[in-house]
Amino acid sequence: MTRRFALIFVAFMATASLVLAACGAQTPALPALTDPKEILTESVLSLKDLKTVEVTGTFTGAVTLPELGALDLSTVKISAAADIPGKKAKFSLDAPTVLGTRIDALLLDTAAYYKIAGPLAMMAGGSADKFTKVDVPQESGKPVTDVAELAKQIDEFKALLDKLPTPPTKEADEKCGDQDCYHVSLKLTAADLKALDPTATATDGNFSLDLFTRKNDRLPARIALSVTAPDLGTVGMTFEFKYGGSVSVDAPPADQIAP
C-alpha cells in the first residue's frame, strides 16, 4: 500500500509539474499602457495579424430628411463577418424604420453578391428578391501585411494624431464582456476637422469617438461614435467586435441570383 501510494504521489507531482511548466510557458502579459495615442496606435497595429472578425452594430437617435420627416434609427441593426485570409465576408443591414431598407451582401474573393429592399434598390440597381452579382477587381498595390507599407501607414497615423487640435484622452479602464479594456475618447468640433483638412467639405457639428481596446492583445473590442449637428440632432453608433471564430460564407444558389 505504501509503495502504491508513493507511485501515485510521484505521478501526481509529475503531472502537476507539467501543468505548472505549461502555465509558465504562456505568452507573458503585455506591458500596461497609459498614453492614449499609444493605445490608439497599438490598436491599429494589432489588426495586421487579423484572421477572422465578427461585427455587430446598433444605432440611436433619429435623422430628419426633407419630405420624409424624422426617421427612427433605434431599430437599425448591422452585422458583418470576415475571413481575411480566405477573402470572404458577409454583411447585413436591417433598417425597418428607414423606409423598410434591408441590405444583404456577400463577398467571395473576386465576386460579390447583394440584394436590397427599399428605395435604395432603385439607386443601386439591385433587387429585394434575388442577389445581383458583380465582379470585384483584384487588389493592387502592397498588402497591408507588407512590413514597409505597414510601418508607413503607422507613421502616417501617428502624424495625424499629433495634428489633432484636441488630443485623445485616456478614460478609466472598463470591462468589455469578459475582457479588460483600455478606454480612449476623442472629441472633435467642425473647426477641428477643418483644421485637419482645409479642403474638406464644411460640416457643422460635434463628433466624438470612444475606443475600447482589449488589454491582452490590443484588438478593438468596441467603438462608439456620436455625431451632433443642428439639422441632424444626435446620432449614435456602437460597434462590437469578436475575433477568432469560424466564418462561413457561401455563394447563393443559382436560382437565387438575378440574370
Task: For every predicted segment, state its role.
Residues M1-M13:
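Bacterial N-terminal signal peptides that target proteins for export
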Residues T2, G24-P259:
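Subset-of-secretome marker
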Residues V19-A22:
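C-terminal motif of bacterial Sec signal peptides marking the signal peptidase cleavage site
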